[in-house]
Amino acid sequence: NYSLGYPMTHGGWERDYVMRLVRKADFISWPKNIHSAPIVKGSTIKTTKAMEHHKDEGLSQMVRKTNRYSDIEATQFYDGKMAPVTSLTLIRKWWIESFRRGFLKRGLQDGKIGLIQSLYQGYSVFISYAKLYEKQRATK
């Protein structure tokens, strides 16, 4: 995975096994969940060769994607009857995701880009929960 033009070797982005190539005849459907995999007939295999994935060209693109995906995720959370969002929930979700990416998955070893990505992933999770809060508040 590349982000902002740099290869990501830590933080959970380094070995991203995603089904990328599917024979049309074996394709059944694709669930609407974020980061879901296609449903196919038969078995699947993992290749031994890596495929370059340039996930973000710039921060503006990242923010646009976050805004789009967080709308979907907040709706899924809301439809799943998630517990009410509190101030502590918002702080905790941001902090835990940033800590997980930066320290537990060693994203900070990727330098400044690892720091940016680790903090940004926390922000992305925060936005999803903030939008869930917005939905919960609107139905009171």
Enumerate the language-model features and the residues they cover.
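Catalytic-site signature of metal-activated, phosphate-bearing donor transferases
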Residues: N1-T139
